[in-house]
């Protein structure tokens, strides 16, 4: 099986990258693993033009297609993301918004292969354990 582990943080050598490396190293014993970092790709924001609803293609020419090719390659996709103000980083959100041409569940044009498994790992760090515990418990 092929596994894609995606660092969804704009910080390429932080805590998220550390988790990506640990997960990737563990999985390499059994699987064909690739790791990518969202910060290595040029991702424009969705313009909300809805052109993709009719054509199944985005009018923007950036690196989103390169990430989708990695998704197509993989049987399992693991997204590892920090929490920024209780949400995902803007870069990851921009990517998700731009996935509409490939995986809009209401669109007959959706082209992402079915049968893939997806997992997510969310990180929360803070200046103290007390702060992290408060977020985890709520």
In which residue ranges do the predicted regions lie?
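N-terminal beta1-alpha1-beta2 submodule of the flavodoxin-like/Rossmannoid cofactor-binding fold
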Residues: 1-108
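Short, glycine-/small-residue-rich phosphate/pyrophosphate-handling segment
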Residues: 91, 107-138
